Each structure stands twice: as C-alpha cells, then as structure tokens.
Curated annotation (Swiss-Prot):
Lineage: Bacteria, Bacillati, Cyanobacteriota, Cyanophyceae, Oscillatoriophycideae
Organism: Gloeothece citriformis (strain PCC 7424) (Cyanothece sp. (strain PCC 7424))
Main location: cytoplasm
One matching Pfam family: PdxJ
Name of the protein this chain belongs to: Pyridoxine 5'-phosphate synthase
Binding annotation for 3-amino-2-oxopropyl phosphate: N7, R18, G192, G213, H214
Amino acid sequence: MLTLGVNIDHVATIRQARRTVEPDPLAAAVLAELGGADGITVHLREDRRHIQDRDVRLLRQTVRTHLNLEMAPTEEMISIALDIKPDYVTLVPEKREEVTTEGGIDLVSNFTRFAQVVDQLQGAGIPVSWFIDADPAQIEAASKTGAKFIELHTGKYAEALNEESRAQELESLKKGCEQALSLGLRVNAGHGLTYWNVYPVACLPGMEELNIGHSIISRAVLIGIDKAVREMKLAMRGQV
C-alpha cells in the first residue's frame, strides 16, 4: 500500500526565521503521525538553514513510524548518519545558493565515490535511497551502487506549464518506476507534489512512498498539521 512521508523542514524554517525555540519540529512530527503520516522526513542541510543536528537526534528518539534523513553525500553528513542511524537515508544533491533541491543527483558522473557511500551506510545497517531524475542511465547507476531505494524527482511533473507537458513528465515517471522495479529497486517519489497534482503519481504501479512537505505545511498553517496530513492521504486516493 502506498505510504506518505511527511517532510517537516518548513516547521523548522519558521522557527529559524526568529532563531527561537518554536514551532518545535518534534511536536510537528507527533501531530503528523497522529494525522496518519507513515514516516517523517527531514533534510539536514550543510548550511543548517532549517533542521538542526539536535532536531535529528531528538526525532530519532521520538518518531514512532520511520525517520528518513535527507542529506548530501558528504563526509560530515555520513558521519552524522552513522551516529544517529535513521531508518533510512535519502542522498540528495545540494547547492548553498538554491532555495530548495533543484533536481536529482548525478550518479553517472560520480559513480565510484557514491557506490562507496552506499557501502559505508548500508554496511552499518542504514538503507540508502538516491534522489534522482527519471533518467534511464541514472536509474541503472542507482541499481549498480547497491542502494535499496530510489526517490524519483517529481519537480518537472509538478512544475509543468500545461497538461501536455505534465502528461509527458508523468509518462517519464511511469517508465522510470517500471525500470527501477525491474532492477530490484524500491521506488519512492517526491518534490513539488500538492493536494491537486498528487493523485496521478500515487497511481503509478509499484510506487511505495511519497515524500511531501511544503504543500502539507502550507495547509497546516491554516487548519493544523494532523488535519492537513489526513487531507493529503485522501488526495493520494483521489478523494480531494
């Protein structure tokens, strides 16, 4: 059954805007789980613009579903992951000047080093997911690194300017999902998904989990996190 991972980064974004102690991402995680979240996702960025190290450590102790740690494949982040041991890690590209992650990681150009990263993390019992575009070469490379999962980048689908472009991007995601499954990879997806565009992605055969943050937190500002999560789960079933 398709599951929902709720990204709570932007709860921390609001907190860090004033460098204060609230709103607390831990409280947000609890409410998200009460609302039906199947997992909690946080991105510990190198610049610490929202989620902080302390948040990840406390979430590791309090999350009752599963904790997905998004991070760049750097030595610093690998060391943190090996210490905290999240339920799994999603490795993403990162640029300091970007507002949010802009695309999938390039495994083809950095294959040897990234395969070693997978060995390090999975050797310590931490399953690895690669955040990649629905590109056949990248999916093939992800499989060859030995990773357990991929997360397909849905940004191009979400940002498509017309229905024709959106249909083309959805077809690319469908083919990417099929290829990944044929290679023995488990498939997640995320980036830019909202209440209004999530259902077609949720219908893709073999899709395991959708990771969604900004849309849920934006809605939660108005109606509360638990209700916003419930509504997203309805949207994933085409009931919104």
